[in-house]
Design a protein with these regions (language model features):
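Short beta-strand "acidic-cap" motif of Rossmann-like dinucleotide-binding folds
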Residues: 91-93
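Phosphate-binding beta-alpha-beta segment of Rossmann-like dinucleotide-binding domains, i.e.
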Residues: 11-67
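Gly/Ala-rich phosphate-binding loop of Rossmann-like dinucleotide-binding domains
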Residues: 81, 85, 172
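N-terminal Rossmann-fold NAD(P) dinucleotide-binding loop
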Residues: 77-78
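A short helix->loop->beta-strand "cap" motif at the edges of active sites that frequently abuts
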Residues: 8-12, 88-89, 150-152, 174-175
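An N-terminal-biased, well-structured beta-alpha scaffold segment characteristic
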Residues: 1-13, 141
Length: 175
């Protein structure tokens, strides 16, 4: 939040809230596709002129009709929800205030008494698109990581503090 000294000194503040939402949402989609199809492996194979795909790659099922959890329904999260609908994905969302939203199949929220872990347990993808504050710091912690499917992908489009990094490392090593 803005410090009183800013106003006392007559400094003009402007905001471009939402201006980058389309690009950030596209970025999230790029990460989702890259993770789904193991883009680094495909790029290495192409560089090495290996045209036969591995059995593991050929068994990948894509994003079509999978479930995505959008955590934070601001402008970026809402745009992510809109874009993933082109893959006929089921969109679950977590937002502290919202009761319903366009392009979202079901909205969960703390003010409604919902449990974030219930949403996470259903998701093949989780996209974090919320601001970092006292309520969202480590919103993804050991309990949330444990609630997620072992095959789920986590895409953090917000600040690093949204995820408890040591808990994530532990979950990746032993989960």
């Amino acid at each position: 939040s803005t410090k009183p000294e800013v106003f006392e000194r007559g400094i003009i503040l402007t905001s471009s809230s939402g201006r980058s939402a389309p690009a950030l949402a596209e970025h999230a989609l790029m990460f989702m596709l890259s993770l789904t199809y193991d883009l680094p492996m495909l790029m290495r194979a192409q560089k090495e002129h290996k045209w036969a795909v591995s059995r593991e790659y050929s068994e990948k099922t894509g994003m079509y009709r999978k479930t995505v959890g959008v955590i934070g329904l601001g402008m970026t999260g809402s745009e992510v929800a809109r874009l993933v609908k082109s893959f006929d994905m089921k969109v679950l969302a977590w937002d502290r205030r919202r009761k319903e939203a366009q392009n979202v199949d079901q909205v969960y929220g703390a003010e409604n008494g919902d449990n974030l872990n219930e949403l996470l347990a259903q998701c093949d993808y989780v996209v974090l698109s919320l601001e970092l504050n006292d309520q969202t710091f480590h919103i993804i912690d050991a309990a949330q990581l444990a609630a997620m499917k072992k095959t789920a992908f986590l895409v953090n489009m917000g600040r690093g503090g949204l995820v408890n990094e040591p808990a994530m490392i532990e979950a990746l090593k032993h989960g």
